[in-house]
Amino acid sequence: MPLTIRKANINDLLKTFEWANEKEVIKNSIERSKKIEINEHSTWFKKYITLKFSSLFIVSLRSEKIGLVRIDYKKKEFFLSYLVDRKKRNKGYGYQMLNKIIKKFKNKKKVFKARVKRSNLASNSIFIKLGFKIKYTNQDKNTFLYRLET
């Protein structure tokens, strides 16, 4: 069954809040190390979905929301981050959703980048499978920066 991708809207606020507070999401996050409160998430989410140089996409399988892909645009670079619902992990959906997003924007001659913790083996594997190359390693933050030119 093919995945569908659409821009996030206000109706996705609670689901994205739930995902943001999942144990594995927090563990693999570069930006934070603890749960967030609904007020903080709500403020961020409402602002984020209106930003000109960022996009948040909800990924669904049939009518079930199974993950999201976030893109931050800087010049001609697309910085990617994503998550998959804990019930849908290890089934290939992370690869499928990122591949679909990359294909959606491929004709725009962009550079895709992603920062991933070394310990996040699943995401490291997915970005390599998608053709990303390691641009550099940040020893302090224990992360890789991946890059893909289209």
Predicted regions and their residues:
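A short, well-structured alpha-helix characteristic of acyl/acetyltransferase catalytic modules
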Residues: 1-32
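Conserved acetyl-CoA pyrophosphate-binding loop and the N-cap/start of the following alpha-helix
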Residues: 88, 92-101
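Acetyl-CoA-dependent GNAT
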Residues: 34-87, 138
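Hydrophobic adenine-recognition pocket in adenosine-nucleotide-binding enzymes
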Residues: 8, 84, 116
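Conserved active-site alpha-helix within GNAT-family acetyltransferase domains
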Residues: 95, 118-136
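C-terminal "cap" of GNAT-fold acetyltransferases
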Residues: 139-150
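Conserved GNAT acetyl-CoA-binding A-motif
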Residues: 106-117
